[in-house]
A protein has these predicted regions:
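Extended ligand-binding regions for polar small-molecule ligands
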Residues: 43-55, 115-116, 205-242
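Ligand-binding clefts/hinges and TM-proximal coupling segments of bilobed small-molecule sensing domains
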Residues: 59, 137-150, 190, 223-246
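Extracytoplasmic small-molecule ligand-binding "clamshell" domains
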Residues: 18-94, 132, 229, 239
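Short helix-initiation/N-cap motifs at beta->coil->alpha
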Residues: 61-72, 151-162, 199
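Flexible hinge/capping segments at coil-to-helix
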Residues: 110-129
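N-terminal signal peptide c-region/cleavage motif recognized by signal peptidases
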Residues: 11-17
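Periplasmic-binding protein-like
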Residues: 27-29, 104-107, 183-223, 242-246
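A ligand-binding cleft/hinge motif common to bilobed small-molecule-binding domains
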Residues: 71-72, 85-93, 169-190, 195-199
Length: 246
């Protein structure tokens, strides 16, 4: 048997060895990035995580949970992976990052047909009541830029419902997340319009503090391979093809 085959076999067995700590993987309910489809995890980040696990010979389960719960689980101990986190200086002190895996577009939405009226009363839109998902980069960006963020919700779906019921006037979220949130809220995506574009944010896999650096490096290496052979780009196109080009 060739030596190279034995080396590969040993590496695969080591990565899947019973003594290797299980990785608890959590995705947030944010279609099309990660979400539950008929009880099974799906989405861009989920598919990418499965591809990386295939390369590493691992089969750790992926659970879809609310962002607040995922964050608290990651803070509780090692061997936790959050599938989609924006890298910030504060989070760098708490987590280890692999990526980026895609770029999020930070957008403010208004009910379609209301924007002209809103601008007449407040040209800069800074005084309007606004909402965003709690703890998200969208909420942090809006607040940091001086917008009047009066409501933070547990999910993008709840934020969409509140916007459409006029509980607030502006909804800050990711352009890639808006269609799924609107549909789950019982509305069509074309019932809202873009009020402001606030830039982009790179999204990463985030491992909790204390997770083995060797495991994090293995994920980073597998992601580099998927990027090099074009697989990452194919997965991105599959799940984000609906986004308009700017």
């Amino acid at each position: 048997m060739p030596c190279w085959f034995l080396l590969l076999l040993c590496a695969g067995l080591a990565s899947a060895a019973p003594g290797a700590p299980a990785l608890k993987i959590y995705g947030m309910d944010s279609k099309p990035v990660s979400y539950a489809d008929a009880g099974q995890p799906a989405g861009l980040a989920v598919e990418l995580a499965h591809r990386i696990q295939d390369k590493l010979g691992r089969h750790d389960a992926i659970d879809i949970v609310p962002w607040a719960r995922a964050q608290s689980l990651a803070e509780a101990g090692p061997n936790v992976l959050l599938l989609t986190v924006v890298r910030t200086p504060e989070r760098e002190r708490q987590m280890q990052f692999v990526g980026p895996i895609f770029t999020s577009r930070v957008v403010a939405y208004a009910i379609k047909g209301r924007l002209a009226e809103l601008r007449r009363h407040d040209p800069g839109l800074y005084k309007l009541h606004a909402g965003a998902r709690r703890g998200s980069i969208f909420a942090n960006t809006a607040r940091g830029l001086g917008f009047n963020l009066t409501d933070e919700t547990n999910t993008s779906e709840i934020a969409a419902k509140m916007l459409m019921s006029r509980r607030f006037d502006l909804w800050f979220d990711g352009e890639e997340l808006m269609p799924g949130a609107m549909e789950r809220a019982g509305h069509r995506p074309d019932e809202v319009e873009v009020a402001l574009r606030l830039g982009t944010a790179e999204v990463y896999f985030a491992f909790s503090s204390g997770t083995s650096k060797e495991l994090v490096k293995a994920w980073a290496g597998a992601l580099r391979e998927l990027k090099h052979d074009g697989s990452l780009q194919k997965i991105q196109r599959k799940w984000l093809a609906f986004l308009p080009e700017h």
